[in-house]
Design a protein with these regions (language model features):
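Helix-rich interaction surfaces within compact, conserved domain-sized segments
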Residues: 6-7, 18-19, 32, 79-125
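N-terminal, charge-rich interaction modules
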Residues: 1-50
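Short, intrinsically disordered low-complexity segments
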Residues: 39-68
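Mid-chain, well-packed structural core segment of small domains
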Residues: 58-89
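Short, charged/polar micro-motifs that form catalytic or ligand-binding hotspots
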Residues: 10, 68, 72-73, 98-102
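Noncatalytic linker/hinge segments flanking ATPase motor cores
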Residues: 47-54, 72-78, 108-117
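Charged, low-complexity, helix/coiled-coil-prone segments
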Residues: 22-31, 51-62, 96-103
Length: 126
């Protein structure tokens, strides 16, 4: 797909993560399983974006209760292709998904999780 296409996986069950990684290899997308200790890092750093450095902080909170997937460096066609192939592969869905943007690139993973979880709860009640 593209050299910059990258998907970050947070608290994704190992078997499912392996399925996603296999799909991504076929599509030319890099993947990273983000460790709990890195949840306090900025998304730009976790996605390997130039100009972001690891901060001297370590996450001390609990594991996220839900899985989260963050897309970086993927245009809408790439994202659509990935999601279509994801469904075809019968990989169980991940409820919390986000695209890295100029706005949220400076957020910490834990902040994005909280925001997505709130939004997900609102949509579940609708």
């Amino acid at each position: 797909m593209a050299d910059t296409a990258h998907i970050l996986l947070f608290h994704v069950e190992s078997g499912k993560a392996q399925q996603i990684e296999s799909l991504c290899r076929k599509l030319g997308i890099r993947t990273s399983r983000v460790k709990l200790s890195s949840y306090s890092q900025k998304l730009g750093y976790l996605a390997g974006i130039s100009g972001f450095r690891r901060e001297n902080t370590s996450y001390a909170g609990a594991e996220f209760p839900s899985e989260m997937m963050v897309f970086s460096g993927m245009n809408s066609d790439m994202l659509d292709c990935f999601l279509e192939e994801y469904k075809k592969a019968f990989i169980p869905p991940i409820g919390l998904k986000a695209v890295l943007t100029p706005h949220n690139i400076f957020w910490r993973a834990e902040d994005l999780y909280r925001e997505l979880f709130k939004e997900h709860q609102v949509f579940q009640k609708s």
